[in-house]
Amino acid sequence: MQFFGRLVNTFSGVTNLFSNPFRVKEVAVADYTSSDRVREEGQLILFQNTPNRTWDCVLVNPRNSQSGFRLFQLELEADALVNFHQYSSQLLPFYESSPQVLHTEVLQHLTDLIRNHPSWSVAHLAVELGIRECFHHSRIISCANCAENEEGCTPLHLACRKGDGEILVELVQYCHTQMDVTDYKGETVFHYAVQGDNSQVLQLLGRNAVAGLNQVNNQGLTPLHLACQLGKQEMVRVLLLCNARCNIMGPNGYPIHSAMKFSQKGCAEMIISMDSSQIHSKDPRYGASPLHWAKNAEMARMLLKRGCNVNSTSSAGNTALHVAVMRNRFDCAIVLLTHGANADARGEHGNTPLHLAMSKDNVEMIKALIVFGAEVDTPNDFGETPTFLASKIGRLVTRKAILTLLRTVGAEYCFPPIHGVPAEQGSAAPHHPFSLERAQPPPISLNNLELQDLMHISRARKPAFILGSMRDEKRTHDHLLCLDGGGVKGLIIIQLLIAIEKASGVATKDLFDWVAGTSTGGILALAILHSKSMAYMRGMYFRMKDEVFRGSRPYESGPLEEFLKREFGEHTKMTDVRKPKVMLTGTLSDRQPAELHLFRNYDAPETVREPRFNQNVNLRPPAQPSDQLVWRAARSSGAAPTYFRPNGRFLDGGLLANNPTLDAMTEIHEYNQDLIRKGQANKVKKLSIVVSLGTGRSPQVPVTCVDVFRPSNPWELAKTVFGAKELGKMVVDCCTDPDGRAVDRARAWCEMVGIQYFRLNPQLGTDIMLDEVSDTVLVNALWETEVYIYEHREEFQKLIQLLLSP
């Protein structure tokens, strides 16, 4: 027993040693009958607790004099007297005005506030305590406009920051507090309310006060600036409803610029929706638009969708693309480029974005700019070309690769002009160990797209084989353009068409009489039909992938359908535009075996051949071209299984004709035969050129096993599963293969009947999925396409000559 007694005493001593001396505890007043009363103020008594050798402060319950609350228990008399004086001057209004104070938890909170904030008035304490009845006490009312010494804030400031609307009403209606006061930082009650979480407080302030709504603090921020900086979207909405001004300058410009600087998309959208002119506002420091301040792709995309000028310039002449390149914001730069940013815009000191990318040693950015049309030999105001800036790159490997790249595009390695020296002499590079010589570049390695591949791309872009002659508008032969399927890899087709247009100087629509497309090729065929530029389509594809390929497969069809409606019109019919003739492939899946269907913008030719199947089954015929909606035709041709759900009874045309060349030639032959049967032989035009564009050839890889059999052990089971997977992939690839024998058959057919056949399809270094969304991967694919164009420049030159000939 003695052992347990000593253990209890020891534990009690340790507990007392580490216990909080200011912990509020409910006690009986009778426990202090033997203690001396050192001080007494109202219901507050300071006892000298002789047995424990402590000084205890007890608040006697005004409603029950037999009980009380010990507020502290201190060992030093001096500390006890200081705290007693502090408590006695602050507690009286609270226990006199509200019985809620007489609870242990409330008293603990209140006494902690008194100690932690010695400069607070009773009104400040009442706000933080949050008991409404206290604000009816005369002493608290008298302190309603007092400012504390820590921040210079009034009780109303605290109520706003706390977000307590009920206390705010008490202060305004019963205490008649002033609402136009500021703290030491110059912040009004609106600034404090913005930092809270209750937008109703802002609404109450807006109804009761106008002063301070648009006032700037010592940092030059209005409440609206601060709300944008903190990302308080609801606060921004309420401030705008209270008529907060959007045109007050802050240190970073208008509130819209603050929202952009801190990437607060919701706040920026709210401001623009309330005042659309803010999207064009310029900040005072740089003269920059909100788009210049965009730090990520999402913010830039939001502004561009709302009509922001993508090529707006700052005071220094820089566009948003200049800023994105300077800050190495690749994703943001891609968004700007795909929305029409001028890749050759001259900014401060005449620098183009490519000049800046060179100085930043950003290879991916350089690729993107060149792919989107940036010129590599443009000098700035100092006569410096991108070549010269590339020579300053610190890393030797990168420097040599980029300099070689620029040399291969025809850029001259020249120094800035020297005063007093003729331009021809001043621009000549002196002989030194690093001078560039015109040497043949090493073979291209498309399997490993690294820096050395940069050196070849611009040669593809250089219009070395541009022909000035225009074709005869009354030519007697037809030209056919065939576009493969391939999802987002349709970008490769677009890049090939851009090269053809650039070399010929003629729009694709005017170069071809027939256009056939499957899936993504079908969308591009319709784009050609409706006179959409290929540069626009390139940007459109980059934008489309982010809208359509969201989540996991199969993707929702809604975004794709809305996209097609937006681009081609919700009510546009196939026959609304009849030149050139366009056909899109689709697969009718409501029958077995499935059949190929062509969506046309002309009447289908009548054939004399016997039906392939006996019509014992009542199958609904497809819609006539005059009734067929364009967007539905595009949706039906691109309904790739496992990627999107079927569009009614239509599946992706790639299942039967991923390379539509032979089907298109068959259609043209049947069309001409129908004209002859109808006595219109004079309208028949012989097909003279067939151009087939692919979406890139994936690299060939070995397959270890396609054996599927009945397994007899776990090892064989695993082997069978793996073989079934590989076999399934092989079957799909064989069904949708646009190359191989499909190309051989088309070429052979054309050679037999004297038709010029061109198959353009670059070899890719990596396998790219139909739903690829990585900007870097897609830019590299376009880069490889440009390299391919350069390597096949003679074939391109021959093609252009034939297309432009009568």
Curated annotation (Swiss-Prot):
- Residue ranges crossing the lipid bilayer per the database entry: 480-500, 511-531
Q: Does the keyword Transmembrane helix apply?
A: yes
Tell me the impact of changing residue 741 to Q.
In PARK14; has no effect on phospholipase, lysophospholipase and thioesterase activities
User: What does it catalyze?
Assistant: a 1,2-diacyl-sn-glycero-3-phosphocholine + H2O = a 1-acyl-sn-glycero-3-phosphocholine + a fatty acid + H(+); a 1-O-alkyl-2-acyl-sn-glycero-3-phosphocholine + H2O = a 1-O-alkyl-sn-glycero-3-phosphocholine + a fatty acid + H(+); 1,2-dihexadecanoyl-sn-glycero-3-phosphocholine + H2O = 1-hexadecanoyl-sn-glycero-3-phosphocholine + hexadecanoate + H(+); 1-hexadecanoyl-2-(9Z-octadecenoyl)-sn-glycero-3-phosphocholine + H2O = 1-hexadecanoyl-sn-glycero-3-phosphocholine + (9Z)-octadecenoate + H(+)
Q: Repeats (ANK): which ranges? A: 120-147, 151-181, 185-215, 219-248, 251-281, 286-312, 316-345, 349-378, 382-403
Question: In which tissues does this protein get expressed?
Answer: Four different transcripts were found to be expressed in a distinct tissue distribution.
| Result for mutant: residue 517 to C | In NBIA2A; complete loss of phospholipase and lysophospholipase activities
Motif (GXSXG) on chain = 517-521
Catalytic-site annotation from UniProt: 519, 652
Region annotation (Calmodulin-binding (IQ motif)) maps to 748-759
- What effect is documented for mutating residue 638 to R? In NBIA2A; complete loss of phospholipase and lysophospholipase activities
- Gene3D superfamilies referenced in this protein's UniProt entry, alphabetically: Ankyrin repeat-containing domain, Cytosolic phospholipase A2 catalytic domain
- Motif GXGXXG: chain residues: 485-490
- The first-level EC class reads hydrolase
Q: Where is this motif: DGA/G?
A: 652-654
Question: How is the protein's activity regulated, according to its record?
Answer: Activated by ATP. Inhibited by calcium-activated calmodulin. Inhibited by bromoenol lactone (BEL).
What does this protein do, in the record's words? Calcium-independent phospholipase involved in phospholipid remodeling with implications in cellular membrane homeostasis, mitochondrial integrity and signal transduction. Hydrolyzes the ester bond of the fatty acyl group attached at sn-1 or sn-2 position of phospholipids (phospholipase A1 and A2 activity respectively), producing lysophospholipids that are used in deacylation-reacylation cycles.
The record ties this protein, via PANTHER family, to: 85_88 KDA CALCIUM-INDEPENDENT PHOSPHOLIPASE A2, CALCIUM-INDEPENDENT PHOSPHOLIPASE A2
Tell me, how does this one assemble? Homodimer formed by catalytic domains tightly interacting through a large hydrophobic interface. The contact area involves 3 alpha helices, several loops and a part of the beta sheet from each monomer. Both active sites of the dimer are in close proximity adopting an open conformation that provide sufficient space for phospholipid access and favoring cooperativity in deacylation-reacylation reactions. Each monomer has 9 ankyrin repeats stacked side-by-side in an elongated structure oriented outwards from the catalytic core.
Q: What is this protein called?
A: 85/88 kDa calcium-independent phospholipase A2
